[in-house]
Amino acid sequence: MAAERKGGFTRGKGLLEPYLARQRASRANRLIPAELRAGCILDIGCGSYPYFLAHTAFKDKFAIDQLPAAVDEGEIHWHTLNLNKEPSLPFDEAFFDVVTMLAVAEHLNPASLVNLLGEVHRTLMPGGRVIITTPAARADGLLRWMARIGLVSAEEIGEHTFAYTLPLLGWYFGRVGFGMERVHFGYFELGLNMWATADR
């Protein structure tokens, strides 16, 4: 969710960061139904270089991050917002077809995440989808070790607030109004990362 170096993938340095960003983007793209791409997407916590939005096809693209864009992405409608302080999304109800939160949840405390998911539910169109990726809780210690030796960004890992599990994400989805029969989960990157989708 934090800002990134110009032309980079994540804030700070890490040998594996470009690979991990590409993996998240690839996973998210595979989880988006083709029929939704004719509408609007919002990427929450996209970073100041919006790698995923630059590598996905949608009619209209919107971005939220806590710092301004570091590069000129003319096709992206940019909004600067710190979601830990202000969880309300500045959009009308049923505005988006897809909302993505890639490597964002771990930067939010549970109360902020629940509030944000409520806003996501409000702004999704009926039939729309939210997609989340976040490190598995069991990967937390490994990620901190990888940050110490320069494989992943120490700045990003240092800002991880909470380590989530798939059952907990599912409970949060249900709490804000998503039907559990429309929630799906899985792992990738050898079980160290998780994805979750919920359809409104």
Report residues per predicted region.
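Conserved N-terminal segment of class I S-adenosyl-L-methionine
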Residues: M1-D92, V98-T100, V114-L117, F162-A163, ...
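S-adenosyl-L-methionine-dependent methyltransferase catalytic module, highlighting the catalytic core
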Residues: G7, R11-P18, R22-Q23, V98-M101, ...
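Hydrophobic adenine-recognition pocket in adenosine-nucleotide-binding enzymes
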Residues: V104
